[in-house]
Amino acid sequence: MQLPRWWELGDPCAWTGQGRGTRRMSPATTGTFLLTVYSIFSKVHSDRNVYPSAGVLFVHVLEREYFKGEFPPYPKPGEISNDPITFNTNLMGYPDRPGWLRYIQRTPYSDGVLYGSPTAENVGKPTIIEITAYNRRTFETARHNLIINVMSAEDFPLPYQAEFFIKNMNVEEMLASEVLGDFLGAVKNVWQPERLNAINITSALDRGGRVPLPINDLKEGVYVMVGADVPFSSCLREVENPQNQLRCSQEMEPVITCDKKFRTQFYIDWCKISLVDKTKQVSTYQEVIRGEGILPDGGEYKPPSDSLKSRDYYTDFLITLAVPSAVALVLFLILAYIMCCRREGVEKRNMQTPDIQLVHHSAIQKSTKELRDMSKNREIAWPLSTLPVFHPVTGEMIPPLHTDNYDSTNMPLMQTQQNLPHQTQIPQQQTTGKWYP
């Protein structure tokens, strides 16, 4: 790299001393110089190239210690900085990552992980991932580029694939190289293949699983797909026998002879294992027969005329009004016939009614009419109960309780003894002394 002229001689405006013999830079120029050197070397080391294979699990760890060097040193000397750092990853020029690439970071104090399984469509196409690190204490950022060059695999895809569900692991724990290596070693002891690769890892939450409760160190669970070049072993085939299928339908653990080889570190749900044999799958792909690319001749195109004929809506208007009106008229005539022409009449009804019943109803009507007339006229003669009577004791004639001009509408239905002016007083029995006849 060819350095500029001012790099060799320094800033002439910042020289101190007399003459050109003492070329010493000021502190401000020294700081600018170091910052420029820091930026140049950061740019040089900002890009990383990785070469994963198609159909094989790709794991890239975003180490916090690596990105700490991109931020200024901790202000207090002698103290180790442990700033919270988060990462944002996206495909260059796009807001998100490719469909096959996933990212996870549990806390700002843990490393981030990019993982996924590239497909054959990505072979030969460099995929540039922009990685932006955020320092949550100083709010500073640093950006690196990860260039993924997908290489083609010789035996892609592997013909025999098995997917295991591990209940006691989270996805970030399973992505650790030593844990994944231990699992592949256990599978290799059971399967005995010549070639074994991890194809993909998926969290149980991405398959519709529930978030575990924060008790008893419960895990989310993870699906691990592996592929091999030899048929499945007899131990793996034990899951498909009817006895184990029945136990799985009853939510019971199946009996697997090789489970003890995994139980020391991995708790596998054998009811959720999936065995895929690519050699027995019938290809549904149909070859597309391409034609000449020439459309059949449909004749000369004739666009519609510019002058449109006027449409007469008079007939539509008549039909719209005439049909409902005719239906309404017919219904009206039927109703009028039923109400007017089908009545029996009073005379016919009386002829069919017995005489005794007519007399009974006539008396009731006569009494009702008389009571109504009496209620309307309050000036009629008083009943016989209000005429003058003799006093039961003295024999004197007592005038009526009410005069002729008394307003009977305000008269109470019942009167107390105090309201009666001519009430006879009955002597009370003496309680003290002697009584002689």
UniProtKB/Swiss-Prot annotation:
Q: Does the keyword Transmembrane apply?
A: yes
Which residue ranges are assigned to the Cytoplasmic compartment in the record's topology?
339-437
Q: Which UniProt keywords apply?
A: Cell membrane, Cell projection, Cytoplasm, Cytoskeleton, Glycoprotein, Golgi apparatus, Membrane, Transmembrane, Transmembrane helix, Ubl conjugation
For this protein, the record's Pfam families field holds: Sarcoglycan_2, Sarcoglycan_2_C
Q: What are the TM regions of this chain, as residue ranges? A: 318-338
What is the membrane topology here?
A: Single-pass membrane protein
Residue ranges annotated as coiled coil are none
- GO cellular component terms listed in the entry, alphabetical order: cytoskeleton; dendrite membrane; Golgi apparatus; plasma membrane; sarcoglycan complex; sarcolemma
User: In what way is this protein post-translationally modified?
Assistant: N-glycosylated.
Q: Name the family.
A: Belongs to the sarcoglycan alpha/epsilon family.
Q: Does the keyword Cell membrane apply?
A: yes
Cited InterPro entries: Cadg, Sarcoglycan_alpha/epsilon, Sarcoglycan_C, Sarcoglycan_N
Query: Which residues get glycosylated?
Result: 200
In which domain of life is the source organism classified?
Eukaryota
**Residue ranges, Extracellular side:** 1-317
Q: What does this protein do?
A: Component of the sarcoglycan complex, a subcomplex of the dystrophin-glycoprotein complex which forms a link between the F-actin cytoskeleton and the extracellular matrix.
- Protein location: Cell membrane, Sarcolemma; Cytoplasm, Cytoskeleton; Cell projection, Dendrite; Golgi apparatus
Protein name (record)? Epsilon-sarcoglycan
Q: Which organism is it from?
A: Pongo abelii (Sumatran orangutan)
